[in-house]
């Protein structure tokens, strides 16, 4: 009987703790790497040099830049994100109104009620409103990450994806990146800045006790949601 009294509150707390878990939805979903497709079987054409041989996979002419163009090729992304935004608004409204009405003659029996044989009426109204708001946001992200080509689009653009994991003490930091790269923007050092990548998805998250310390507790979130203030 004593164990039942203890187990019931304990199970309730465990259920509430499980419901309090909020899963993180990553911006870069799916696999973060790609393997090159196996080379097709060579067709004899009478030449000594066969470009489709496995040992010559990725062959490029001597005077052509070495740029990624196949699935599995790598590319270095230079992260240079600096976004700043500000917004302010204000509004003022004022309205005044006055109305008067007078009657110089009135029945004699209303003299005692109205006074001096006349009836006067005056209405005055005043309404004033003022509002002001503002918001500022600044975000800076810098670094490098090497990604892999996982798709070659019909127009020649490359869809790239990559992930970097860094373990620090008892926590792990994840940097994920995906986007579409125009091969013409790739420099001679096989790199491109993140500002030249279309549909860029940049994610920097971590796990461990430091990340858990930055998460609000389930009971605190409960009171935050139900509190009217």
Curated annotation (Swiss-Prot):
Pfam families in alphabetical order: FlgH
Keywords, ordered alphabetically: Bacterial flagellum, Cell outer membrane, Lipoprotein, Membrane, Palmitate, Signal
GO cellular component: bacterial-type flagellum basal body, distal rod, L ring; cell outer membrane
Source organism superkingdom: Bacteria
Family from the record: Belongs to the FlgH family.
NCBIfam families: PRK00249.1-1
Protein name per Swiss-Prot or TrEMBL: Flagellar L-ring protein 2
Source organism per UniProt: Yersinia pestis
């Amino acid at each position: 009987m004593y164990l039942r009294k203890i187990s019931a509150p304990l199970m309730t707390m465990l259920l509430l703790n499980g419901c309090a878990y909020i899963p993180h939805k990553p911006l870069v979903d799916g696999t973060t790497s790609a393997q090159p497709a196996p080379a097709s079987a060579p067709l004899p054409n009478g030449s000594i040099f066969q470009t489709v041989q496995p040992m010559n996979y990725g062959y490029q002419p001597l005077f052509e830049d070495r740029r990624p163009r196949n699935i599995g090729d790598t590319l270095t992304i230079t992260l240079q994100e600096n976004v700043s935004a500000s917004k302010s608004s204000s509004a003022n409204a004022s309205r005044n109104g006055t109305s008067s009405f007078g009657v110089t003659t009135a029945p004699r029996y209303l003299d005692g009620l109205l006074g001096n044989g006349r009836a006067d009426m005056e209405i005055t109204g005043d309404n004033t409103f003022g509002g002001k708001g503002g918001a500022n946001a600044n975000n800076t992200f810098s670094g490098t990450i090497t990604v892999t080509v996982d798709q070659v689009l019909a127009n020649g653009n490359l869809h790239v994806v990559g992930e970097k994991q860094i373990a620090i003490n008892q926590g792990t930091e994840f940097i994920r990146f995906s986007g579409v790269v125009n091969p013409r923007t790739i420099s001679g050092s096989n790199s491109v800045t993140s500002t030249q990548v279309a549909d860029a998805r940049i994610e920097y998250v971590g796990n461990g006790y430091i990340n858990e310390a930055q998460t609000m507790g389930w009971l605190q979130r409960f009171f935050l949601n139900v509190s009217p203030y």
